[in-house]
Design a protein with these regions (language model features):
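Extended charged
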Residues: 1-16, 81-207
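Histidine-centered nuclease catalytic patch
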Residues: 17, 23-36, 42-74, 82-97
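Short, contiguous alpha-helical
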Residues: 78
Length: 207
């Protein structure tokens, strides 16, 4: 597999609308199958592999540019990072912003995939997984203290990024977003996690 792509937490005024519109486009839905097959059903940001509950995101951030070479496979944890302003809308995404400069966003998402499977399937390391995840969740308090009340809510931060003048957004990205990570919420991803966990358990049993 080629090197993983980096994730920059982001929010825009129109990308979410375009991302959702194409989900009802039968031609695009067929086209995304080609993207998943090319990428071997593997998230290009965290290396998580699954047959179901995958998404397709646009590399250049332009959701009008739907050329095959501009589309890559992403899991739900990584996908939501590109649409901060829309997290929590309906059934889309869920999580909190935490202070975690020692891990990249992709590394944190990959770790959460492992932790959630351990917690759901009741592996021997379940308690350790639960404690580690809890310790990450507590880091949202640092964000609230250092950057402002409510800013551990990704949708709120996303709306702030959309509304900020362009030059201020670049400054904020340099000062804050390089140290912030989006921690996926286990409850909001319950359906996907349970499905992935069953698949992982089946693979262990029959491998």
């Amino acid at each position: 597999m080629t090197s993983l792509r980096a994730i920059m937490l982001s929010a825009t005024e129109s990308n979410w609308r375009l991302f959702m519109l194409r989900k009802s486009d039968s031609a695009f839905l067929a086209f995304q199958q080609a993207v998943w097959r090319r990428d071997d059903y593997t998230c290009q940001f965290c290396a998580f592999r699954a047959v179901d509950y995958l998404e397709v995101v646009n590399v250049d951030g332009n959701y009008l540019n739907n050329r095959l070479d501009n589309l890559v496979t992403a899991c739900g944890f990584c996908t939501q990072c590109f649409f901060l302003e829309s997290i929590g809308k309906g059934t889309f995404g869920g999580g909190s912003l935490i202070y975690c400069p020692e891990l990249t966003q992709g590394e944190l998402n990959a770790l959460c995939h492992v932790l959630f499977v351990a917690m759901i399937n009741g592996f021997a390391c379940t308690l350790q997984a639960r404690n580690l995840y809890r310790s990450f969740k507590l880091r949202h308090q640092i964000v609230e203290k250092e950057w402002g009340e409510g800013l551990s809510n990704p949708a709120l931060l996303g709306c702030l990024l959309v509304d900020l003048p362009h030059h201020n957004v670049d400054t904020f990205k340099g000062e804050a977003l390089t140290k912030l990570r989006l921690l996926p919420d286990m409850v909001r991803f319950k359906t996907e996690i349970e499905h992935w966990s069953r698949a992982a358990l089946t693979e262990l049993i029959f491998s």
